[in-house]
């Protein structure tokens, strides 16, 4: 295969994206199609899924291929991305069996890593009929989840016609964050019928803290006792989304 190059203009933003994916998985397969870059991966417990889609137009350089698959170990990649400086670009050069990753700024730093094949089945999009959608400030969600983590190992999301309530309780205490539909931190609010579900905080704390560095806005979709859907728009285009299974009462 001839060398193909993928270049993203904001390496720091790309580092945040990789951080947000690595909350769930240590390695994963990427797919380049002629319209964009994609990733979909399931955690080892099969209770959480991450979905990444970045359109071709978001890249400075993009491979001229119909389809290209490559797998990366995020531990090795994050070693390089820790050295990202403001204004750096990141490029990936794909050769047979390996990927040369460069940080391009005042200097060029690079590593060469193997393109691994991560074994796993094709993952369909979960079929959930959601009854509540709230678009709100992502840092509010991150703070609410962090507060919940201080007192419990699970958090409850409740959507009514008037508000979204995020709460947690245990012997350590109680926490409640209420987002009224008319709050200045709520940008869209559509509740067709009330919904509530409980979720483990195992991933939610890291997901919300890391993705709030990417996007100022989060879209939350709920249905009673169904997986929660969290979606974060990427400034350059595209989005990173999560499905997290509920805890059964």
From Swiss-Prot:
Keywords: DNA replication, DNA-binding. Pfam families: PCNA_C, PCNA_N. InterPro entries: DNA_clamp_sf, Pr_cel_nuc_antig, Pr_cel_nuc_antig_C, Pr_cel_nuc_antig_CS, Pr_cel_nuc_antig_N. One of its GO terms (molecular function) is DNA binding. Gene3D superfamilies: 3.70.10.10. It comes from the Archaea. GO terms for biological process: leading strand elongation; regulation of DNA replication. Belongs to the PCNA family. Homotrimer. The subunits circularize to form a toroid; DNA passes through its center. Replication factor C (RFC) is required to load the toroid on the DNA. Sliding clamp subunit that acts as a moving platform for DNA processing. Responsible for tethering the catalytic subunit of DNA polymerase and other proteins to DNA during high-speed replication. This is DNA polymerase sliding clamp 1. It comes from Pyrobaculum aerophilum (strain ATCC 51768 / DSM 7523 / JCM 9630 / CIP 104966 / NBRC 100827 / IM2). The lineage of its organism: Archaea, Thermoproteota, Thermoprotei, Thermoproteales, Thermoproteaceae. The gene is pcn1.
């Amino acid at each position: 295969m001839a060398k193909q190059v993928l270049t993203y203009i904001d390496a720091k933003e790309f580092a945040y994206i990789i951080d947000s994916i690595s909350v769930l998985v240590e390695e994963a397969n990427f797919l380049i199609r002629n319209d964009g870059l994609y990733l979909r991966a399931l955690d080892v417990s099969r209770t959480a899924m991450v979905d990444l889609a970045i359109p071709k137009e978001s890249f400075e350089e993009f491979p001229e291929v119909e389809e290209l698959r490559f797998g990366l170990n995020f531990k090795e990649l994050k070693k390089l991305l820790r050295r990202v400086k403001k204004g750096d670009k990141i490029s990936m050069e794909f050769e047979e069996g390996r990927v040369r990753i460069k940080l391009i700024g005042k200097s060029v730093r690079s590593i060469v890593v193997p393109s691994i094949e991560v074994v796993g089945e094709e993952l369909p999009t979960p079929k959930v009929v959601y009854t509540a959608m709230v678009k709100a400030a992502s840092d509010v969600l991150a703070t609410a989840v962090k507060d919940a983590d201080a007192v419990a190992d699970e958090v409850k999301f409740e959507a009514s016609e008037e508000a979204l309530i995020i709460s947690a309780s245990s012997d350590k205490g109680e926490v409640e964050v209420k987002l009224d539909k008319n709050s200045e931190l709520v940008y869209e609010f559509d509740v067709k019928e009330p919904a509530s579900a409980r979720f483990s905080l195992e991933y939610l704390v890291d997901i919300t803290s890391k993705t709030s560095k990417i996007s100022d806005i989060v879209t939350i979709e709920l249905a009673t006792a169904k997986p929660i859907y969290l979606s974060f728009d990427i400034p350059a285009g595209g989005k990173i989304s999560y499905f997290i299974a509920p805890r059964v009462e």
